[in-house]
Design a protein with these regions (language model features):
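Central beta-strand plus flanking loop segment that forms part of the substrate or channel wall
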Residues: 96-109
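The conserved catalytic core of RNA pseudouridine synthases
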Residues: 59-86, 120-177, 203-227
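A short alpha->loop->secondary-structure connector
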Residues: 45-47, 90-97
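Internal amphipathic helical hairpin motif
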Residues: 45-56, 123
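Pseudouridine synthases involved in rRNA/tRNA modification
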Residues: 1-26, 32-36, 136, 150-152, ...
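Short, solvent-exposed loop/turn segments at secondary-structure boundaries
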Residues: 39-42
């Protein structure tokens, strides 16, 4: 099998990372859209959340990632012990994440569940695919918050709650539902007339709930979507 070659070069991101809260153990940030979570192998993809934060917080590590185009809440561990404890919470699905998104079209039902297994396919890289045979279980909940009745580009604002954490899960699940996320270049969010000039992926990590590994305090972080 031939090696997968990632030719993506991230354009410069001039937006700053917003530090929302910190203590000696962890940092909560608001990641801007258009910034990698981790630096890529290509030297031109050096700029990232981790690259920037390690300058201020030496030894910090990423517990989880957000896609390049996704903005919003991330928790950063400031040492290996905190990283291990938070990773355990993620692996046990003890961390609750909620996203805000704008979807193309008017979603028919006010709420629902998308249960569709997701598979990697080297032939489709970087796209993922829905596949009942080789896919891993993937489940997302959605709730309609508002519908916008613009005749040229009808949209729906939704809350998305992933119950699993597959690559591109929310993006491909919304496409599977029939309403791609506005601005999504991989899964149909730039295909409709009027979407060509959308400046970003309209997906934002707006809620992050976990237990502080040291104090055992429930952390319920919130950050409103900028769209």
């Amino acid at each position: 099998m031939s090696a997968i070659i990632d030719s993506f070069i991230a354009p410069p991101c001039h937006d700053e990372i917003e530090i929302l809260w910190q203590d000696e153990h962890l940092v909560l940030i608001n990641k801007p859209s258009g910034l990698l979570s981790l630096s890529g192998k290509n030297p031109q993809n050096r700029d990232s959340v981790h690259y920037r934060l390690v300058q201020t917080f030496p030894g910090c590590t990423l517990v989880h990632r957000l896609d390049f185009g996704t903005s919003g809440l991330m928790v950063i561990a400031r040492n290996k012990a905190i990283n291990a404890a938070l990773c355990h919470q993620f692996s046990q699905r003890a961390v609750r994440k909620v996203y805000s998104a704008l979807l193309c079209g008017h979603v028919e039902h006010d709420e629902g569940v998308i249960d569709a297994p997701i598979a990697k396919d080297p032939a489709l890289f970087p796209l993922m695919s829905i596949c009942a045979i080789t896919g891993k279980p993937a489940r997302s909940r959605y709730q309609v918050m508002d519908r916008f009745y613009d005749a040229a580009l009808p949209l729906t604002r939704v809350r998305l709650t992933p119950e699993t954490g597959r690559t591109h899960q929310l993006r491909i699940h919304c496409q599977q539902l029939g309403y791609p996320i506005l601005g999504c270049d991989l899964y149909g969010g730039l295909a409709l007339p009027g979407t060509e000039q959308i400046p970003r992926l309209m997906l934002h990590a707006s809620e992050l709930n976990f237990v502080h590994p040291v104090s055992a305090e429930a952390i319920n972080a919130r950050h409103a979507a900028p769209f």
